Swiss-Prot record:
Domain of life: Bacteria
Paired cysteines (S-S): none
Species of provenance: Staphylococcus aureus (strain bovine RF122 / ET3-1)
Gene of this entry: crtN
Range of residues in the leader sequence: none
Protein name per Swiss-Prot or TrEMBL: 4,4'-diapophytoene desaturase (4,4'-diaponeurosporene-forming)
Length: 502
């Protein structure tokens, strides 16, 4: 069969490879000049920067794409586990190194507060149990009809997840120490979630880091996008770049998706899998006579969106890779207040920031004697933060100054401005324009209880035959391992439909 995949982000690349490995003819359409989507790369002034995700968690999910296509993952990506997850800075003289080794972890916890290990381990145990339930009964399955969700098994297993509790509540149930609470709560921002609103399951990330380890891909995270692109080429997939989709064509008589309009041409296909950002697809790519019924264009703005980010890609003329960790977090003096600012639409003047220094793990990512630095500052998305004008150069200059002051918390970056030889910024406006991410949301729809599982945009269209969706705004959600799972379960449903002649 002829299959079209819209979008060459990590979801589209993984899905296309899985489909092609089943013997089908697959074409990927990507509007940008390169593959990767939000897993993007910037090469500038001799530096190589990952532009989006940077932390490799759940490596088996990465490997699975290659092995399920009959390939050896080691021929495409080179993974290695990190001994230390990150350095955390509460202020300049208060730094904690978070290890993966259990004995070192206990020592770290006890140094923060004697006796805190028990609560921390109880937290990890509780979250691991919830993760196993969620993975088996909710995350790795699709919901094609109401009975797939509304059944006794889902009711019983869902009750065990205690989804009415929020991430903050679960953390505070086990952890009394404010520093350790911050360590756990901050990580919900990795997928754009407000810990006060996100279901307690989304405090899962610290557990995943501890249980499965944190890894690094040679060449940076973009090495995964390159590996997937090569996998697709090896499987005979055709990747068309600079190919902007104008419309998904729906046959009104048979209510099926049978073509796409791309760069002015109508291209016929047997099935279409769309991995572009779902809200933008529902708003802009469906014909007027054939909207997605649950998500018509006029309702898209009313959905809840994850936060956005202001990113900086900085090159400096000194090599500091032996003085800083690969991954670093610098906390705001008022962490809770900063969270409120992000999700109430206000700009922070004392943000918590994430700092990634890829040459610590791979010297090839910066010129000899120099260092590339990636900085992420969580911000409101464009709807909640409608009062922030990201096109205002005076404003972005002010934010850069805020970030440079915050970077000075790390001693080696105290005089960073005098060493800058390259600087690039990426704003919420850029997320919206570059990736068609609605409201510049960095992680798609926020996974609130009302936008999770059965209530999230589904992988198989309920309105039109031969139309499928995958990606961060669809089930099961955002984050690289999760969108890879989205690709897997969606392709499984498509292959099942093909085998059954649906």
């Amino acid at each position: 069969m002829k299959i079209a995949v819209i979008g060459a982000g990590v979801t589209g690349l993984a899905a296309a490879a899985r489909i092609a490995s089943q013997g089908h003819e697959v074409t990927i359409f990507e509007k940008n000049t390169n593959v990767g989507g939000r897993m993007n790369q910037l090469k500038k002034d001799g530096f190589t920067f990952d532009m989006g995700p940077t932390i490799v968690m759940m490596p088996d999910v990465y490997k699975d794409v290659f092995t399920m296509c009959g390939k050896n993952y080691e021929d495409y990506i080179e993974l290695r586990q990190l001994r230390y997850i990150y350095d955390v800075y509460f202020d300049r003289d208060d730094r904690i190194t978070v290890p993966t080794d259990l004995a070192e972890l206990q020592h770290m916890l006890e140094s923060i507060e004697p006796g805190s290990t028990h609560g921390f381990m109880s937290f990890l145990t509780d979250v691991y149990k919830k993760y196993e339930i969620a993975r088996r009964y909710f995350l790795e399955r699709t919901y094609r009809k109401p009975s797939d969700f509304y059944n006794m098994t889902s009711l019983v297993q869902g009750a065990k997840l205690k989804t009415l509790n929020h991430a903050d509540q679960l953390i505070e149930h086990y952890i009394d120490n404010e520093k350790i609470q911050k360590l756990l709560a901050f990580q919900t921002l990795y997928i754009g979630i407000d810990p006060k609103r996100g279901p307690s399951l989304y405090s899962i990330i610290p557990m995943i880091e501890m249980m499965f380890g944190v890894h690094f891909i040679k060449g940076g995270m973009y090495g995964m996008a390159q590996g997937l692109a090569q996998l697709n080429k090896d499987l005979g997939v055709n990747i068309e770049l600079n190919a902007e989709i104008e419309q998904i064509i729906i046959d009104p008589k048979f209510k099926r998706a049978d073509a796409i309009k791309v760069n002015g041409d109508i291209r016929k296909f047997d099935k279409i899998l769309c991995t572009a950002d779902f809200p933008s697809v529902a708003e802009s790519l469906m014909p007027d006579f054939a909207p997605i019924k649950k998500y018509p264009p006029h309702k898209i703005a009313d959905l809840d969106y994850s936060c956005s980010a202001f990113l900086m890609y900085i090159g400096i003329d000194i090599d500091v890779t032996d003085q800083v960790r690969l991954h670093n977090v610098i906390f705001s003096d008022d962490f809770r207040g900063n969270i409120e600012e992000i999700f109430e639409g206000r700009l922070s003047y004392d943000p918590s920031i994430y700092v990634y220094v890829p040459a610590v793990a791979d010297k090839s990512l910066a010129p000899e004697g120099k260092t590339g630095i990636y900085v992420l500052m969580p911000t409101p998305e464009l709807k909640t933060g409608s009062g922030i004008d990201w096109s205002d150069e005076a404003l972005t200059q002010q934010i850069k100054e805020i970030i440079y002051r915050k970077l000075a918390t790390i001693e080696v970056f105290e005089d960073i401005k005098s060493h800058i030889v390259s600087e690039t910024i990426f704003t919420p406006n850029d997320f919206e324009q570059t990736y068609h991410a609605k409201f510049g949301s960095a992680f798609g729809l926020m996974p609130t209880l009302a936008q999770s599982n059965y209530y999230r945009p589904q992988n198989v269209s309920r309105d039109y035959k031969d139309l499928y969706f995958a990606g961060a705004s669809t089930h099961p959600g955002a984050g690289v391992p999760i969108v890879l799972t989205s690709a897997k379960i969606t392709v499984d449903e498509m292959v099942k439909d093909i085998e059954q002649g649906v």
